[in-house]
Amino acid sequence: MITVDFGNRIRELRTKTGLSQEKFALKIGMDRTYYASVESGRRNISLINIEKIADGLGVSLNELFAFNKENDND
């Protein structure tokens, strides 16, 4: 599921920064519980918030969406 794949990707990138969910959410101006639900794949996210996450992580949108989709055959 794309929301889970996206959540796993942003978790991977966030942990590389050394920031907790709370500190990262604060950095990008997002509520921690909302961010946590996106990272866990339980919530859809708007394009505006995707851009905030990419900017906060210092990556391009292409890099943000560079997760492995080989198991998705539908």
Model regions and ranges:
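DNA major-groove recognition helix of helix-turn-helix/homeodomain DNA-binding modules
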Residues: 49-63
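Helix-turn-helix DNA-binding elements, focusing on the entry/boundary residues of the two helices
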Residues: 10, 21, 32, 47-50
